[in-house]
């Protein structure tokens, strides 16, 4: 697996064209829709605490010029909580179909997919495959805990299929700079995108 370094992210930033914005320009102000994938069925209390720390670090990169729309919320879940959370938030029974339909509907809106890997998750591979081959195929950020390395060959080195960044970590705080640079790259790119012309 190719692990992107902070230097790689910095080079990507340097290669992204900048566009001067006029005062009051709406460019970059549209919310960035984030789909944050976390393990559920194989996640215990220790993983839940680690996920919570990572979610807090992600939120420190939330820029009012390109605010985050958390499609999947900001709550760290575990095997003991995610079904109850779904039924409470969605007001419908937890079934495989209901949960799958809901998740794929969110994936279809995602401007970026953040995959927090702190444990084994078959569902993560399913959602990632959908995102690449049928969904938005928008940029992916893998946050890979060193105690839960990616062993599945088919989800390693995905650069030829989509834009993907892999960051490995031991402690959540090690991700701070890489997460900040990833979102800075996305917001800079959005600011540089042409503004669509609306004809009256």
Question: Where do the PLM segments sit?
Answer:
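Conserved catalytic or regulatory cores that recognize and/or transform ribose-phosphate-containing ligands
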Residues: 1-200
């Amino acid at each position: 697996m190719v692990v992107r370094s902070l230097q790689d992210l910095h080079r990507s930033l340097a290669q992204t064209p900048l566009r001067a914005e006029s005062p009051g320009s709406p460019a970059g102000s549209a919310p960035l829709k984030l789909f944050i994938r976390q393990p559920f069925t194989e996640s215990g209390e220790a993983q839940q605490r680690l996920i919570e720390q990572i979610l807090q670090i992600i939120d420190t990169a939330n820029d009012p010029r390109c605010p985050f729309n958390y499609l999947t919320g900001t709550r760290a879940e575990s095997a003991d909580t995610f079904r109850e959370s779904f039924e409470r938030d969605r007001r419908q029974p937890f079934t495989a179909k209901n949960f799958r339909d809901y998740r794929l509907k969110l994936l279809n809106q995602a401007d970026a997919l953040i995959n927090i890997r702190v444990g084994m998750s078959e569902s993560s591979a399913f959602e990632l495959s959908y995102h690449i081959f049928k969904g938005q195929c928008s940029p992916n950020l893998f946050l890979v805990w060193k105690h839960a390395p990616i062993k599945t060959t088919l989800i390693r080195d995905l650069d030829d299929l989509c834009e993907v960044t892999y960051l490995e970590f031991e402690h959540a705080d090690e991700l701070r700079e890489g997460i900040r640079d990833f979102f800075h790259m996305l917001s800079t790119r959005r600011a540089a995108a042409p503004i669509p012309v609306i004809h009256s």
